[in-house]
């Protein structure tokens, strides 16, 4: 059913404002007129609004709905004159079929919202006008733009100092972390070294002649103790040395040292062979040069040498001569200048039935310390094992000149008995030892002191004193005499000059005198 229009034609707008009014007078929207149900009656509100819009061809008026009363309000806008005329027309034409709610809008927004008024004075006729059309403040147009900061010279200096201080703090912090990590590594390395050097020590040596001699007879041990006391283990030098000891294998360190001294050792061996003819007391061979090493490395090597010496002495006292030879050989690689190590290894070789090796070690011990009583005794025992009784008797006589030696007197008596038997047989010496004599003998018995001793069929293999603590290094030459040996092991026995057979009875006479004195 089509609505019945109440009126036809344009609606007469009784607006008090005219287009000719000055802008400053009508800059703000003014309420012109209100429309209610009594104005459009039964007419369709859409048709009424269309006629209302057509009555304002210049687009100076806007229609709003009062939220409180629900009446239509006609507002007058002079600032849209000439600026939004065309836009108002196009908007009115496009919104004709959309009802009153879509009239005069752009994308759902009123033109009054898109283009706010230029003055902030609200309309005096309606209190809702100020809320519907908010005023534009000058502060909205004054946008704060970013500006370049102007820094003074004092401020720049202060900022520079702060940056430098912060950088220094970061450097100090990094340095502290580095030092802390370094200390932790040093502490761990020191613990590993102490754990390595603090291996289970050998059982305490039994009392007897085989115990190490006292301090006057142990100059090497005294020197080691003094050197260890003089070292400051907390110093940086010692810590660096210990680090090198922990990183380098022992064999590599020793081989490096041995490569630096082969020439000196060869000269010492030649001079020792040339001076064999003179009495042992007059021998003064040139000792081989020492390996240049730092105090820290020397202290660690000496400590390991002492540990291996104790182990070797313990094995020798219990009759394990093969194992003792291995330990003494390892100890000699760490401390090749200790004459006691060669004497103890000579003792083990003599007990194993290897007189040639025993003679070589005894000669080296006397080279390192000429006139050493235990070295002379070991030399005599090795000569007895080689059936060279006349030379052995001369060595035992030299030993007795240094003081009372019951063992030397007993061995001298045995040598004289062998020489007497040879003289009765027409001066024919006993045949040399067979190759089997160099092998260890299986028979063993306990000596009076409780130490096992080997029974030798050709000589009285009595227990000989003089075992000393030795040091450590891996190599074994006891079971492979034909293989190339290290420089400390490659010394072959130098044949002593045989004496005139006519002097044999002189030796017997001197031997009897020494035997009577020893008793």
Curated annotation (Swiss-Prot):
Among Pfam families, the record links this protein to: TPR_16
Sorted alphabetically, which keywords does the UniProt record give? Coiled coil, Phosphoprotein, Repeat, TPR repeat
Name the source's superkingdom: Eukaryota
The record's section on SMART domains has: TPR
Q: Where is the composition biased (Basic residues)?
A: 175-187
Q: Where are the TPR repeats?
A: 305-338, 339-372, 373-406
User: What stretch or stretches form a coiled coil here?
Assistant: 147-197
PROSITE patterns according to UniProt: TPR (PS50005), TPR_REGION (PS50293)
- Note the SS bond partners: none
Q: Where is the composition biased (Polar residues)?
A: 481-490
* Region ranges (Disordered): 175-230, 253-294, 474-506
| PTM sites of type Phosphoserine | 278
Under the heading PANTHER family, the entry gives:
TETRATRICOPEPTIDE REPEAT PROTEIN 31 (PTHR47678:SF1)
Q: What is the official name of this protein in its record?
A: Tetratricopeptide repeat protein 31
Task: Please state the gene responsible for encoding this protein.
Answer: TTC31
